[in-house]
Amino acid sequence: MSPLFSHIGRNLSMAKQPFMVFRLSLTPDEAVARCVTHWRTFKIQSETPGMREQFALAGWVGTELVIGNNGKAFLADAIATSSATAAVAELFPKALPDRVRRAFVEKNFVEIIARPLAGSGGRMCELWCRLDYTSTNETFFQEDFFASVLGKLEQSFQSDQVMLAPLEHLSSRELPTDVPLTLPALRALRQAAKKNRR
């Protein structure tokens, strides 16, 4: 079986280490705003209503983006697996632009939160990005899309020389207890946000 369609051949790093941690010479508000703006350049516009307020109550600046569409992704994946698109993409992995890869993205959530670094007077922060990554697609276009977006985010911070330390990738086991990005914590925040909208 071609690695393009192999579950074993997929890059599982996003599933195993869904947390990205940046330490930046930006305020928490600036860092979150830049990250959200970056995602919006890829036509990601939707936020979970009320999550900004819930993160603020937990002591963080942040939000939750809603990305992708299951029905659209299923159709795009079905077409690709039965066409020459997959063969072309395997031979030329960068041939498909991000706007095409985005069509393969199933519904996922991206949490973006930040808080000041201790002793920085609020002028530096740690920015956390969590990708709630799931996929039932047979192709790797969804993985490629996320890898491209997140890679370009890191590059933008590097080019602006605002990174204070190398990017960290963490697993769920490595998540500090005071970071509200566990599944139970997020579930509680979403429920509270939904309740407040009523």
Label the predicted regions.
Residues 2-197:
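Ser/Thr-rich, low-complexity intrinsically disordered terminal regions
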